[in-house]
């Protein structure tokens, strides 16, 4: 049997911290901050020296079938690296957190070729 490609349309809604508890790295995203804001809305922002992230989106599949995702920068922003690092608006390398295959499917549906599974 030949492979069948199925394109999925998903709707994501903001998630709460309880929704993303116990997530871990599932992949990487190559995207401009402005494009993520246009697609996902404004992220949660953190302004704390030594903190490992600067911005984070908490998302979940509205149907509940594909679980939750986090999109965040990790150790590549000013919080972790100081003022000489690029501001969050210039970051293009993002981590994606989730729970296994369902989260990978959700990330692929949302971000297509910009997402690479870990």
Protein language model regions, located:
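Residues within mature, well-folded domains
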Residues: 2-118
